[in-house]
């Protein structure tokens, strides 16, 4: 609410909230799930007025994801993985407390910065919660986003196998060079608790 409230004047914000409670049929009685309902409400086009920021829905979704990670009861596993395993030869294991998002630079939006037109290229954001329980974000590029997606979608593949798929998709001829780049990225992800290591069934 804090960011959305800061980019809309008080009357417009109150009118939007009032329309949400008056017109939207919430499907949940749980307070922590109200932000998800608000995103659904905005996505339907209800309550929107001419002059509203074009990124309002994306901002609401981003703040909802922050809340989801902050309130999640998921925990980092204590066993069942190699914290220092080889991220290319073995099977990388992702933290359950991360999400890859793409849209406006909503993490930078404030009263002074409100982009009015879409970016020429998609902006990718990685939002995650570390072992210290703090939710953070980082901007990533499209190949990094795809690398994480491939690991998530192919839990039985080694890092090398995932990189091979990425190289084919990108039409990148030098797989070894891409593997070297990817290893640096994966090591950074492990340092940030986005990767917790490698599975025990691998090296």
Model region roles, listed by residue range:
Residues 91-153:
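Low-complexity, glycine/alanine/valine/leucine- and proline-rich hydrophobic stretches
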Residues 1-83, 133, 138-203:
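Long, charge-rich, low-complexity alpha-helical segments
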Residues 74-101:
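Short, conserved active-site entrance elements at the starts or edges of catalytic domains
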């Amino acid at each position: 609410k804090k960011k959305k409230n800061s980019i809309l004047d008080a009357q417009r914000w109150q009118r939007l909230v009032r329309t949400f409670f008056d017109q939207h049929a919430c499907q949940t009685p749980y307070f922590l799930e109200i932000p998800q309902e608000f995103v659904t409400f905005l996505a339907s086009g209800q309550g929107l007025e001419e002059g509203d920021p074009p990124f309002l829905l994306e901002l609401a979704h981003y703040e909802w994801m922050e809340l989801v990670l902050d309130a999640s009861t998921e925990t980092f596993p204590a066993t069942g993985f190699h914290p220092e395993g080889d991220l290319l030869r073995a099977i990388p294991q992702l933290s359950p407390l991360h999400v890859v998002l793409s849209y406006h630079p909503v993490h930078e939006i404030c009263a002074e910065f409100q982009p009015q037109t879409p970016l020429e290229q998609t902006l990718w954001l990685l939002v995650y919660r570390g072992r210290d329980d703090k939710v953070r974000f980082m901007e990533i590029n499209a190949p990094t986003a795809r690398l994480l997606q491939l690991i998530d979608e192919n839990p039985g593949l080694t890092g090398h196998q995932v990189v091979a798929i990425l190289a084919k998709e990108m039409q990148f001829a030098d797989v070894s060079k891409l593997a070297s780049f990817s290893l640096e990225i994966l090591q950074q992800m492990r340092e940030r608790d986005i990767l917790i290591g490698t599975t025990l069934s691998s090296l």
